[in-house]
Each structure stands twice: as structure tokens, then as C-alpha cells.
UniProtKB/Swiss-Prot annotation:
Name assigned to this protein: Mannan endo-1,4-beta-mannosidase 8
Enzyme class: hydrolase
Coiled-coil features, chain-numbered ranges: none
GO molecular function: mannan endo-1,4-beta-mannosidase activity
Organism field: Oryza sativa subsp. japonica
Source taxonomy: Eukaryota, Viridiplantae, Streptophyta, Embryophyta, Tracheophyta
UniProt KW Mitochondrion keyword: no
Catalyses which reaction(s): Random hydrolysis of (1->4)-beta-D-mannosidic linkages in mannans, galactomannans and glucomannans
The organism's place on the tree of life at top rank: Eukaryota
EC identifiers of the protein: 3.2.1.78
Keywords in alphabetical order: Glycosidase, Hydrolase
Tissue-by-tissue expression: Expressed in stems and leaves and seeds.
Amino acid sequence: MVECSGTQLWASGRPFIIHGFNTYWLMSFAADQATRPRVTAAIAEAAEAGLNVCRTWAFSDGGYRALQTVPFHYDEDVFQALDFVVSEAKRHNMRLILSLCNNWEDYGGKAQYVRWGKEAGLDLTSEDDFFSDPTIKSYYKAFVEAVVTRINTVTNETYKDDPTILAWELINEPRCPSDPSGDTLQAWIEEMASYVKSIDPVHLLEIGIEGFYGLSTPELLPVNPDEYSGHAGTDFIRNHQAPGIDLASIHVYSDTWLPHSIKENHLQFVDKWMQQHIHDAANLLGMPIVVGEFGVSVKDGKFGNEFREDFMKTVYRIFLSSWKEGVIGGGCLLWQLFPEGAEHMDDGYAVIFAKSPSTLSLLANHLRCLEC
């Protein structure tokens, strides 16, 4: 297992640094025999490039080929697809961060949970009721238990005992703007972190937040990209002080967070955002930092690949410097890497292995820096 020791990660008695990537659709592709080879290709090509951790969805709530068809009921074929993903990662010595829900409607998420609640007759008025309604929380807990205690049909290993899984993630990018005080989301994080740890006390646990500072640290609100983000119901410091949380998680998306397109300003923001969170993870929280997502979209022509690579270099440089100085451990996961044949899933952020030699060279250089 990968373990925490202060601000550092360790595995098999050696320091472990995350040099990772996101490919969120692995389970969905594995559920279809026609697209399953893309799963193997994604993991194999990433491993060949020297990457060691993949963050992916372990949820799909309602809709087409859902893992969770309705509360308390799961599609065994899709569960076996997730088994395949985990087994392929194991075969290629790739660790996984498995996210258990989504703040957004993609693949169901909290909106689908609330729809299920309304269909069951609950008086719900907002998607944010996901975080407070007892029945909705029971749906989520049941799903978490089903995943964490799952026995893999390929490896015959229980997920909670499998070292292939580096960490569980409670929810991707949670926000609760209906309660900008942060109390609602904080209570949910504390409850769910305790619940996950009661089932699986061994694996590491992260929240999945973007890293916005909240009302517990008003002096840090100016670090946020805009005024709204300080009222999204999240709080980087307070959220990560919840018992059971092992890793400080942040995302970095200056291309969508900042309204302008002045490239130098974006890189300055990234520098400040990274430096502040690394400082706080090390000195206020005492835990490693995981940049769970970072990237730049080249879809609308606002930015090109040259800027994307400058952006990546900035993220890697700042983390590497802090790690070399012994300040922090953890690592960074690019959003996102694809094999050929999956281009139709590109949201503008995808780096296609076979079509991105300069980006692969950048990834290789970061690996060399981590190893030297």
C-alpha cells in the first residue's frame, strides 16, 4: 500500500511520488467489448511513458450503462468492467485514484441522487440536498460500501485490500453554493470520511475539492481566482482538517477560472496558487498535496499547445522544487491523456499519446527530474 508519513508518500519503504494522469472513462469503455482495448492501450501507453498513477471514475449513476442503476442496485456487467480496469492497472504496475461521485451531472453525480430522492417522494429543492438529506446520504453510503468491499472477479482480491488502489476520492469537485458558510459540505465530508475509514482504514482518502479558500481563512480569499469561488461552500483548510482525510487535493484550471487570456497572467496565477497550497498543506495541514487535475483546453483556439506545455512546466516546476527541498510530497495528475481511437471523448484538454511527441518529452523530462 501507499502510505502517508507526514507530508510524504511512501511505498515499500521508499518515497513515492505521483506522476499521474486522468482518464475518466475507463470503466465505461471497459463495459463494451468493442472499446475495451482502448482501456488497455491507455494504461499501457501511460505506463510506458513513465506515469505511475491514473485517476478515474468508479461511478456511473443512472443513464446508459450505469454502474448504479438505482439506489442499492448495481449492474454486474459494469462492475466487472471496473474489475477489468483495476486488473489492467495492476498488470501494468499502475496505481489508481478512484473517485466515487461527481459534483457535476456527467455520469449522474449529485443531481442523479437528488432525482432518485424526488422519485422516492422526498421533499428536495436543490442538488445541494445531496449533502444534507439523510436518505440521499444513505444511497451514497450504500454505493461506497458496494465498491470498497467489492471482490474483483478478475484478481479475486477485495478492493479494500488491493494495493493497486492508491486512494479513494469522496467526490469530484464538490461545491455547495447554497451554503456559502461551508458548514453543510464540512459536515458531509466529516461524516463520509469517517464512514469510508470504518470500512477501509488502510487506503488513503482524499476529498476531491478544487482548492478554493473559504471563510475559515479570510486572509487567503484573495488567492482564489474570483470572488465567487470563496462562496462555493468549500474551504481548503477547514475541509482538509476533517478526521480521516489523508491527502490535500487541489485542481488547477486558470483557463476557465480567469476571464482574460493574457498568458503571462495565467502562469503567474498558477505559480501563486500552487505555492500557497503547497505551503498550507505542509505547514497548516501536515499532509501531502495531490494536484488531482491540471490542464489547458485548446478547443476554442484561445490557447494552443505551446501555452499548454508552458502551463504544465510551471505546475511541475513548482511541485518539483518543493519536493526536492523536502517541503512536500504527493504529486500531479494531468487532465487528461488518451490513446488513439478515443478522440471523440476529447473535451479540449486531451493529450493524444501518438500525436503529442513534445508533450510526451515533457512528461519524460519531469520523470527524470523526479528520479535524479
